[in-house]
A protein has these predicted regions:
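A domain-start/cap signature at the N-terminus of enzymes
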Residues: 1-8
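Serine-hydrolase catalytic machinery in alpha/beta-hydrolase-like enzymes
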Residues: 16-101
Length: 103
C-alpha cells in the first residue's frame, strides 16, 4: 500500500496548526520537520523551497511534516513576533516525535 501525503491539523499553543504529513513505511525511518519562511513576508508551508525540501526528505525515506505557523493558511491564531511561532514549531516537533517513536 502506497503512503500518501496527508492534510492534518496538529494541536498547537494557539489552536490548530495546519500541516502536511508523510509517514514512511519503514518504522526506523528518520524524521524531518520543515518550517515555513517568515509569515510577515508571505511565507507559508506551500512556499516552493518548503515543498521541494519536503519532497526531498520524503523521497529519501524520511517521515516528514511541513507546518503553517499560527495565523497562516488554515492555522488558528495570529502572528506573535517569533515567540509564538517558536512554540508552534516545538508543538509540531513533539507531535511528529510522538507519531513516529511512541509505542
Amino acid at each position: 500500500m502506497e503512503n500518501k501525503i496527508l492534510e492534518i491539523f496538529i494541536p498547537g499553543p494557539a489552536g490548530r496548526l495546519e500541516a502536511k504529513y508523510f509517514k514512511s513505511q519503514k518504522i526506523t525511518s528518520p524524521i524531518a520537520l520543515v518550517l515555513q519562511p517568515h509569515p510577515q513576508y508571505g511565507g507559508t508551508m506551500n512556499n516552493k523551497v518548503v515543498v521541494d525540501t519536503f519532497h526531498a526528505f520524503m523521497d529519501n525515506g524520511f517521515s516528514v511534516c511541513r507546518v503553517n505557523f499560527r495565523g497562516v493558511g488554515k492555522s488558528d491564531g495570529e502572528f506573535d513576533n517569533g515567540q509564538g511561532e517558536l512554540a508552534d514549531a516545538a508543538a509540531a516537533l513533539d507531535w511528529l516525535e510522538r507519531e513516529n517513536f511512541d509505542n
